[in-house]
Amino acid sequence: MYFMADDEQIRRYEFKRALEELSKLHGRGTELISLYIPPEKQISDVVAYLRDEYSTSSNIKSKSTRKNVLAAIESIMSRLKYYRFPPPNGLVFFVGHIATRGDQTEMYTKIIEPPEPITTFMYKCDSEFHTEMLKAMLDEKEIYGLIVIDRKEATVGFLNGTRIEVVENVQSQVPSKHHQGGQSSRRFERLIEIAANEFFKKVGEIANNAFIPRIKEIRAIFLGGPGATKEYFFEKDYLRNEVKDKIKDLFDVGYTDESGLRELVEKASESIKDMKISREKDLMDRFLREVKKPDGGLAVYGEKAIRDALEQKMVDLLLISEGIRRVKYTYKCPTCGEEKTFSEEPSEWPVCDKDGTPLELIGEDDMIEDLYKLAKESGAQVEIISDQSDEGKLLKQAFGGLAAVLRFIRKDNVQNVM
């Protein structure tokens, strides 16, 4: 994950974690309901559909399965009463009796407003929850600008994640280079260049109007086309400086319509990959430069050291591996009120130090979200690093998935403890 606003990063992290938890849940039978509701779907139509399913499910032979499926459908219908319309991106319900210890089950309900619009209505009753549509939304959604151009045609578009969006395709009125109607060669060439200049100005205007409003979120712009036209278009003043500065590479492509945009994306794929790797490398290099200093420099790693530094508002940059999952477990004595926290689930149930009373579990908090909150409060920059690159693997394996660069060195220093 790269170049996302901090809030977007943590929302993506929370979303991914929720899907991982859902994937671990199973039912005793086919009694877990996954319901996807697109934003344009009428709630009344969904309720009518569920009533039909309720009627059908009344014929399930297994008494326990029938009871659990009917209870899940009733639960969904009761919750739908609170919605006049689906939210802007739709709504997803995961409801059913999940298997717990032994032969026990318990009712589970998870309602998700997805980060992107649901496109298909889906109802499934199975032994597991279906999260495939939501998992597809985890694909990186970096935005790139695209231009393909020659003297006869040009197309401007965006690459949004894996989806190519065409902004506009424009045909030129530039005549072919041959004599017509007895005109002199010099005069005809002049007319051709005037027409070409007007065409390039029009393409530049389309590109500027498309890219300028989104210039901060555009990672890079790629320019392609057959022959030397793309170089000429790039070198002249058809594009505003803000747009030109974002152009990363020029590529030879055979077409200048929508298929040309697809070809441009294929040609630029290595460049996109290199930019992502370069971004992670720069972040990790900054941290490693500090680690290599004799006194450890401004580097800290490990949950305890980083938490201490965040609480003292010392952290400038916080690096979090996308692959780590940590939960803080909080227990409380029902007698004296003593609390204990654990960074891992205890192998044995904890008891009170004072009287040996078994403690009650009162909270399971995601440690990453907790650190993120501290970082936001202190004004630290937060970057969640993929665990697919060499740098991301190093962060996860060598430093426990958590690393930070401080704003200043504290006199008594922060001890790095994994």
Curated annotation (Swiss-Prot):
Question: GO molecular function, one example?
Answer: translation release factor activity, codon specific
Keyword presence, Amino-acid biosynthesis:
no
SMART domains the UniProt entry points to: eRF1_1
Cell compartment(s), UniProt: Cytoplasm
What is the name of the protein in this document? Peptide chain release factor subunit 1
Per the record, the gene is prf1
A GO CC term attached to the entry: cytoplasm
Q: What is the residue range of the signal peptide feature?
A: none
Record's function text: Directs the termination of nascent peptide synthesis (translation) in response to the termination codons UAA, UAG and UGA.
**InterPro entries, alphabetized:** eFR1_2_sf, eRF1_1_Pelota, eRF1_1_sf, eRF1_2, eRF1_3, Peptide_chain-rel_aRF1, Peptide_chain-rel_eRF1/aRF1, Ribosomal_eL30-like_sf
HAMAP family assigned: Rel_fact_arch_1 (MF_00424)
The entry sums up its family as follows: Belongs to the eukaryotic release factor 1 family.
Q: Which UniProt keywords apply?
A: Cytoplasm, Protein biosynthesis
